[in-house]
């Protein structure tokens, strides 16, 4: 009988034995006859309940117990059921119409387990007794067979909880409209390049990209994971499509293949490697990835270390600023305590803003280091994999992911954040900053500076008191001594400083261009000079009436809220600080930080006259407070 032909291999596969026993064959034959009798007495079920188990006619025209999973309506408004066949070695689900659900009576689990005993009961009594006797002998004498059966059941259970795409236990399982389950990540990836959304299992085209989280399945996976987490899940060694051994690796698709896959249209004109050769090729690629990753790791670790050092330095700088603030305000006695508290409050506010970005960047760098360390660990784990099948599974996507992370290198935002504290505000001449409010209290006087005529460019004219300078189109005949500027239109102060703290002011008025700053004693005076700290110049300038710059290397554009008429200059020699202020309201303009090893001189430049628009002189301020 046709049914007997199908049932016998199925029973042999489930029992795990290939023994040809005459009594067993007779028993199986009798069971098939009972199945035929049972089918003759069946009719389509009148009502079908989701979650219940019924006899269902399979696509190969055989009967098998099936659990009803879900239902749907076809375009013709006919009802269909998505069923799961119980007890098969391979998971098999499908949609069936109502006519194929043949038994309305719910089949209990005990009935399923005893199906063979019940069907054998319709055979003659002597054969039934012989079969039961034979069964008891098998149960009593074949413990290994029982163990294999339990293992098979566990494998079936694990198979039901395995994503058909990644072949691993479900992660965030979702269920499609057709009833098939996949990992959320797997189905998203499968649909990325698809023109239409369809189920990878049954190929049913879906109306939209839609799925639902399967929480029940997720809970089952969690429970199953407890039992299998210590077991090694070996990759398949046979092709799912052709049931042939996987002997090749497709370089174009990055997948394992059998010899039939190689000759199929799907892999037409593709390049293949034997598995062992592919292991060698991709192992070399992984090895080549380790070194760049380690280099990137070292770079991130260095940045992390540098950032930590910068944060420590800024913390120390904040402490120094606070001490300076407290010391200066102590000189102003008790009635200035309120102003002191306000300054400390502003410092703390700037501290929070300054350290926030740097500490956030430090966290990013720490995360980068941890991420790269994890990538190295994952790569090393893959390199240590001895099983070629496991090694090559998803190897191409794995390497592409590693390459992508390496190409990123140190992300653009993962650079050293080095924000400067407003030293000009908190560590400057605080008595002058509050001078406008406290003229009756502050009486230190400005540094009495004069200009050195032996350093002045020949087109510069100094006042009789050597306190102002202006440009003239007539070049004066002056001795070309080593101190004199030959090309740059500059003049130095007569008094230099090699210690202490000093403050002075320069009146710039409405001039459209000027330079104000400091110059080292050994700085170059001849020819064209690049004015920056590397060459011994710390200065700011104005050009074209509104373009302010700090002469760093490279120069920095300064955005001032108002155009100053006087520039204040503060030098803290031991502190390595030169700060510039809008002397009208003592708002800080810019601060240079460094270390000084020789005497420093004030320097001025009135610049060119600009057709009379910039003819005003620069003046050193000697007014008492």
UniProtKB/Swiss-Prot annotation:
Residue stretches in coiled coil: 337-386
Transmembrane segments: none
Domain Tudor-knot, first and last residues per copy: 48-101
Sequence ranges assigned to domain B30.2/SPRY in this UniProt record: 429-625
Binding-site positions, Zn(2+): 239, 242, 261, 267
SUPFAM superfamilies referenced in this protein's UniProt entry, alphabetically: B-box zinc-binding domain, Chromo domain-like, Concanavalin A-like lectins/glucanases, RING/U-box
ZnF start-end (B box-type): 234-275
ZnF bounds (RING-type): 163-203
Localization, UniProt: Nucleus; Chromosome
Name this polypeptide is given: Zinc-binding protein A33
């Amino acid at each position: 009988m046709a049914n007997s032909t199908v049932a016998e291999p199925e029973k042999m596969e489930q029992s795990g034995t290939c023994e040809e026993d005459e009594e067993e064959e007779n028993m199986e034959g009798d069971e098939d006859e009972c199945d035929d009798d049972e089918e003759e007495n069946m009719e389509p079920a009148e009502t079908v309940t989701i979650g219940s188990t019924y006899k269902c006619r399979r696509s190969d025209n055989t009967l098998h117990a099936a659990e009803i999973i879900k239902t749907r309506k076809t375009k013709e408004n006919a009802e269909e059921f998505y069923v799961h066949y119980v007890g098969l070695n391979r998971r098999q689900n499908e949609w069936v119409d109502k006519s194929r659900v043949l038994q309305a009576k719910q089949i209990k689990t005990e009935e399923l387990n005893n199906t063979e005993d019940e069907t054998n009961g319709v055979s003659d009594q002597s054969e039934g007794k012989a079969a039961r006797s034979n069964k008891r002998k098998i149960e009593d004498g074949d413990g290994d067979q029982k163990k294999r059966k339990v293992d098979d059941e566990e494998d079936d259970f694990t198979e039901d909880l395995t994503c058909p795409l990644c072949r691993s236990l479900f992660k965030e399982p979702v269920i499609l409209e057709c009833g098939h389950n996949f990992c959320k990540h797997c189905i998203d990836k499968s649909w990325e390049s698809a023109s239409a959304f369809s189920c990878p299992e049954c190929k049913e085209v879906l109306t939209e990209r839609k799925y639902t989280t399967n929480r029940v399945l997720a809970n089952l996976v969690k429970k199953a994971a407890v039992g299998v987490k210590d077991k090694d899940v070996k990759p398949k060694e046979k092709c799912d499509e052709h049931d042939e051994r996987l002997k090749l690796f497709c370089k174009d698709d990055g997948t394992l293949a059998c010899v039939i896959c190689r000759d199929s249209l799907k892999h037409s004109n593709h390049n293949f490697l034997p598995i062992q050769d592919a292991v060698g090729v991709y192992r070399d690629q992984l090895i080549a990835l380790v070194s760049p990753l380690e280099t990137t790791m070292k770079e991130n670790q260095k940045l992390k270390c540098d950032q930590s050092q910068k944060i420590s330095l800024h913390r120390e700088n904040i402490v120094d600023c606070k001490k300076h603030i407290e010391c200066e305000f102590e000189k102003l006695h008790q009635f200035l305590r309120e102003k002191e508290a306000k300054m400390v409050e502003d410092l703390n506010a700037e501290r929070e803003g300054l350290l926030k970005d740097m500490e956030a960047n430090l966290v990013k760098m720490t995360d980068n280091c941890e991420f790269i360390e994890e990538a190295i660990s994952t790569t090393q784990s893959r390199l240590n994999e001895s099983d070629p099948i496991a090694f090559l599974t998803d190897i191409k996507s794995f390497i592409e992911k590693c390459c992508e992370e390496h190409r990123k290198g140190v992300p653009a935002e993962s650079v050293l954040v080095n924000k400067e504290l407003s030293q000009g505000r908190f560590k400057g001449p605080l008595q002058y900053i509050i001078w406008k409010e406290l003229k009756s209290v502050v009486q230190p006087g400005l540094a009495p500076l004069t200009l050195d005529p032996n350093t002045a460019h020949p087109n510069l004219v100094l006042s009789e008191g050597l306190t102002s300078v202006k440009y003239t189109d007539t070049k004066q005949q002056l001795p070309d001594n080593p101190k004199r500027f030959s090309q740059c239109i500059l003049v130095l102060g007569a008094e230099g400083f090699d210690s202490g703290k000093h403050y002075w002011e320069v009146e710039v008025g409405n001039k459209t261009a000027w330079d104000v700053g400091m110059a080292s004693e050994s700085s170059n005076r001849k020819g064209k000079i690049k004015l920056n700290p590397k060459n011994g110049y710390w200065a700011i300038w104005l050009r074209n009436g509104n373009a302010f710059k700090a002469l760093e290397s490279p120069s920095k554009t300064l955005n001032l809220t108002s155009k100053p008429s006087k520039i204040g200059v503060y030098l803290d020699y031991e502190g390595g600080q030169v700060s510039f202020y809008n002397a009208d309201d003592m708002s800080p303009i810019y601060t240079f930080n460094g270390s000084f090893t020789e005497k420093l001189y004030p320097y001025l430049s009135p610049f060119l006259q600009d057709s009379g628009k910039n003819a005003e002189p620069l003046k050193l301020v000697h007014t008492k407070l």
